[in-house]
A protein has these predicted regions:
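Hydrophobic faces of well-ordered beta-strands that scaffold small-molecule active sites
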Residues: 55-59, 117-119, 146-150, 197-201, ...
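His/Asp/Glu-enriched, well-ordered alpha-helical/loop segment
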Residues: 247-263, 305-380, 386, 390-394
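Metal-coordinating catalytic core of metallo-dependent amide/deamination hydrolases
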Residues: 130-267
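Glycine-enriched alpha-helix->loop->beta-strand junction motifs that scaffold or abut catalytic
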Residues: 220-225, 257-258, 263-265, 282-291, ...
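Alpha-helical scaffold segments that flank or form the walls of functional sites
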Residues: 69-145, 177-191, 412-420
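Active-site microenvironment of metallo-dependent hydrolases
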Residues: 1-21, 28-30, 36-38, 353-420
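Active-site gating loops and adjacent loop-to-helix segments of metal-dependent hydrolytic enzymes
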Residues: 67-98, 127, 155-175, 234-264, ...
């Protein structure tokens, strides 16, 4: 790992165009402001042919799904995609496969300028934290900043086809077992400033109402964001209407009004496609945040998120890529470009950068107190990348791993039978 820089000097992205300045970085890898004099350590310096931007935040990702990238047909809808990927192969996921898949995903993110990622991980496979630890190991091996949502999955569809049911059974954990594993993992990473573990929930179709209540409460108690898939497809709406007599956001709103959860302002929900305007009003009232995954939603035919409706209500909006195997790539810059083209009714500035609440150190902006996470572009291409002031990509190459030798070769070997 490279030494942490004490300052970064060059032309930074500004509202009116590039601005020349030098930002100071403290020993913990946070921006302290513009440098007042010569730095006491190494300075990263770039000329006028480079542009320095904050590192992108991928606010919703399933990195282990990168193992399926060569197996998919881009024409598959969501149900077909699930049948031929996670419900066919996730029960076969070993620690090594999770590690290699995540190294592939995190490495490709860093090469695309993504410096922090929020992961939703539910592939526990009856192994406690064994597979979860491999995601964390991959983040450390590549150098990315990881917000790890240890996802609870406590619902098995009894009428599911055999492979789907077997997969769901492998993800399943009782609330008590889940909470023990979560607490264990939080303790294990508590001294790592680049890894945060938080409770996460899958969805209304993969969680009981008890599980949802406990997860929301746990996140509030810990003061951590809780990730949750919200109305990604019509099925969750139909399920909530059948079981609870209300639409998904109405169910969440009712939990607050009955005092079962203290609030929803720490929920980081993804997709939000099949959400009515009245539900958006309640989301704004309860201060939920939304992660949109527009390219993935288009590709699998899930639907189109009403970005303007959310932004009009001042609901904080982040961008994510979901999994690589259900998207074109893992670039948030490409996600942003697609959103600006696909949503001409939305002001481009609304799809820009915003602060992401990474525990202990916010990220996403080049401002004092934020993590010193930067991407340096030369002719529009990512040249160098810094995470917490340490360079992890140089001249378009990941510094910590040889991706072709250390990841791609063994991954192809381990999954060869999947392609036959």
């Amino acid at each position: 790992m490279t030494e942490r820089i004490a300052a970064l000097r060059g032309w930074f992205e500004g509202a009116e165009g590039p601005v020349f300045k030098e930002l100071a970085v403290d020993p913990e890898g946070r921006v302290t402001g513009e440098a007042k004099g010569p730095s006491c350590g190494e300075t990263g310096e770039y000329g006028p042919d480079c542009l320095i931007l904050p590192g992108d935040v991928n606010a919703h990702s399933h990195p282990e799904q990168s193992v399926y990238a060569e197996l998919v047909d881009p024409s598959w809808d969501l149900a077909t995609w699930c049948r031929h990927t996670i419900y066919r192969h996730s029960v076969e996921m070993t620690p090594e496969l999770v590690y290699l898949g995540c190294c592939r995903a995190f490495g490709r993110m860093l090469l695309a300028g993504v410096t922090a990622v929020a992961v939703s991980f539910y592939c526990h496979n009856r192994r406690g934290n064994d597979l979860d630890r491999e995601v964390i190991r991959a983040a450390r091996a590549t150098g990315i900043r990881l917000f790890f949502g240890r996802m609870h999955y406590d619902w098995v569809a009894q009428d599911a086809y055999p492979a789907k049911k077997a997969s769901q059974e492998s993800y399943f954990e009782t609330p008590e077992a889940y909470e023990r594993a979560l607490e264990e993992l939080i303790r294990e990473v508590q001294d790592d400033p680049l890894v945060a573990v938080a409770p996460a929930l899958h969805s209304f179709h993969a969680n009981t109402l008890e599980g949802i209540v406990r997860g929301i409460r746990r996140g509030a108690l810990l003061g951590l964001p809780v990730q949750f898939h919200l109305s990604e497809d019509r099925g969750d709406v139909d399920l909530c209407l059948r079981l609870y007599g209300r639409r998904p956001v109405e169910v969440l709103d009712d939990l607050v009004r009955r005092g079962e959860v203290p609030g929803l302002d720490h929920l980081l929900v993804s997709d939000g496609i099949w959400v009515e305007d009245s539900e958006k009003d309640r989301m704004a009232e309860h201060q939920l945040s939304l992660v949109a995954n527009p390219r993935m939603n288009r590709r699998v035919g899930a639907g189109r998120t009403d970005l303007k409706g959310y932004l009009d209500r001042k609901i904080p909006l982040f961008l994510g890529t979901d999994g690589e195997a259900s998207n074109d790539d893992l670039s948030v810059a490409h996600e942003r470009r697609f959103a600006r083209e696909a949503y001409p009714e939305v002001p481009a500035a609304s799809l820009g950068r915003r602060a992401f609440p990474f525990p202990g150190t916010p990220v996403g902006l080049a401002e004092p107190g934020f993590g010193a996470d930067f991407q340096v572009l030369r002719d529009g291409t990512v040249e160098d990348v810094y995470v917490a002031g340490r360079r992890v990509v140089h001249r378009g190459r990941l510094l910590s791993l040889d991706l072709r030798r250390d990841v791609e070769a063994p991954l192809r070997e381990r999954t060869a039978s999947w392609r036959n």
